């Protein structure tokens, strides 16, 4: 389906100059100030390089090392040509290249941000939810209207032809009944393995494992139970959205709030990744300005649970990542009108 941009800017910032260099932290603390960053949407770190997507169509590269953090370059631009984007949703680092996901293309760049080619996809995918799997792709699509919502996971070959439908889920919650803690149904790929994650308000989180051809192998149930909806949780979910509403939508907040629907329970998670041989999930359990994360091995055995700084949900992207046993996250410093990189040790 066609997607609209749902980003918003936190504040206009026009800062030039060198990046402040700070040593990497041993515990939770400021790592660096990032004057190059104005409107971040996504962050990831791999092999000593940090990539931050911002302003819809570009990304910054920084290096992280014993001497601190240093700005390298910015790559990407708006357009429809080679190496150009109408929107960048995510960057996936691999051993020798980057995959950069847009609305209808998957572009390849070197680890240093040099363009190296791209493929376009003609199938429908919601907000860049496309992964390479074997010689083809797996895509998640989301369609919704006033009456309800439908999510599908499909496998395609290298020529964009449908191979099979992995699964589909639907609900009666649509544009007139907006559920901010909706069920979670998504795909992740690591190597030649497809993981389909399902979390609902009725049962624990399940991860179903498929091979590269879409043949089901097994299902792993994670000890992440649905969370009771309380007035405090409801307020925690609404507040970040309400606080930024006037900057992100022309619709009056009171009108939008009338359409909100909160079930009696939230699903066991709202974020999931497969990273460094682990499952990592973010739950709906808030404690002050922190939220619970949990990690599991690939057999579903729990490795750790920890409350970590909350960076927002919904349209403001993913402003955190895990790297070398630390939780790195971006935080706005309004007083200095600058974005900062912080980190907290996990164990």
Give each language-model segment a name.
Residues 1-2, 19:
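Compositionally biased, low-complexity segments enriched in small residues
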Residues 26-347:
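Eukaryotic scaffold repeat domains enriched in small/polar residues
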Residues 12-23:
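Bacterial N-terminal signal peptides
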Residues 2-14:
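Bacterial N-terminal signal peptides that target proteins for export
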């Amino acid at each position: 389906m066609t997607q609209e941009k749902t980003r918003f800017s936190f504040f206009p910032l026009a800062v030039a100059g060198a990046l402040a260099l700070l040593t990497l932290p041993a515990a939770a603390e400021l790592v660096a100030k990032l004057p190059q960053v104005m409107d971040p949407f996504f962050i990831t770190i791999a092999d000593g390089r940090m990539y931050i997507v911002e302003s819809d169509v570009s990304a910054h590269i920084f290096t992280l090392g014993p001497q601190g953090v240093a700005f390298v370059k910015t790559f990407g631009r708006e357009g429809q040509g080679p190496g150009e984007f109408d929107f960048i949703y995510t960057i996936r680092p691999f051993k020798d290249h980057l995959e950069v996901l847009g609305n209808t293309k998957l572009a390849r760049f070197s680890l240093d941000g040099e363009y190296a080619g791209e493929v376009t996809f003609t199938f429908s995918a919601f907000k860049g939810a496309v992964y390479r799997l074997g010689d083809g792709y797996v895509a998640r699509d989301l369609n919704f209207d006033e009456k309800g919502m439908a999510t599908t996971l499909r496998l395609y070959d290298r020529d964009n032809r449908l191979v099979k439908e992995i699964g589909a889920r639907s609900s009666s919650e649509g544009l007139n009944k907006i559920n901010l803690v909706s069920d979670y149904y998504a795909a992740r790929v690591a190597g030649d393995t497809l993981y389909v994650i399902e979390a609902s308000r009725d049962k624990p989180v399940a991860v179903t494992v498929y091979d590269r051809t879409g043949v089901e192998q097994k299902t792993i149930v994670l000890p992440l139970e649905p969370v009771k909806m309380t007035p405090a949780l409801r307020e925690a979910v609404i507040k970040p959205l309400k606080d930024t509403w006037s900057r992100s939508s022309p619709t009056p907040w009171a009108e939008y709030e009338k359409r909100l629907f909160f079930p009696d329970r939230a699903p066991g998670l709202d974020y999931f990744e497969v990273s460094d041989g682990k499952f990592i999930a973010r739950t709906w359990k808030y404690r002050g300005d922190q939220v619970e994360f949990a990690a599991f091995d690939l057999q579903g055995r729990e490795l750790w649970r920890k409350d970590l700084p909350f960076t927002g949900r919904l349209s403001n992207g993913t402003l955190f990542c895990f790297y070398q046993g630390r939780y790195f996250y971006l935080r706005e410093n309004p007083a200095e009108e600058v974005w900062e990189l912080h980190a907290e040790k996990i164990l």
